[in-house]
């Protein structure tokens, strides 16, 4: 809970298992799961039968939001302000509970609207979703970008995971900080 994660994946891997695990755990805890992806993507195909998962399917075939099914809404791929609005409404709909958001894929966004717009969108999204009760995972195809683009996007995340053909490998996770109470409990009194 409370992490913003960049999941860099090899498209030949079974990276969707990481998303399935996140969704399964969240649903077991009765937490909402919101996934931004393309219809027919690997993630969409693997989780679309889960009616409790809300999909926002990004496409160039609509210019305004359009309800597709009970748990699927079509959104224009190039309308990042609308995506930010959906993030905002999701947060407002669940003001007290934990929220799980998956954004698949940053690579599609970079290739569709360009890197600068994607980076601006990401800065706003990461700030908006920064809360200890939100778990947010953004996916990036490791083979789709030059090193400068990858490095810039990585810089927005303190938690980075790589999922290759051999499975999941943690790249960068911050050290766990002890709470002040735990620190005080272990220290001698009266200094």
Stretches found by the model and what they are:
Residues 1-45:
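Glycine-rich P-loop/Walker A and Walker A-like loops and their local beta1-loop-alpha1 context
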Residues 11-15, 40-42, 62, 107-115, ...:
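Short acidic, S/G/P-rich loop/turn micro-motifs used as interaction or catalytic elements
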Residues 29, 49-51, 155-157:
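Short, structured coil segments at secondary-structure junctions
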Residues 32-38, 54-58, 138-140:
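Short, hydrophobic beta-strand segments that form beta-sheet elements in well-ordered domains
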Residues 41-74:
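Nucleotide-state-sensitive switch-loop elements of NTP-binding domains
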Residues 65-126:
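Phosphate-binding/switch loop-helix module in NTP-utilizing enzymes
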Residues 117-144:
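Substrate-engagement module of ASCE P-loop NTPases
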Residues 134, 140-191:
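Phosphate-binding/switch region of NTP-binding enzymes
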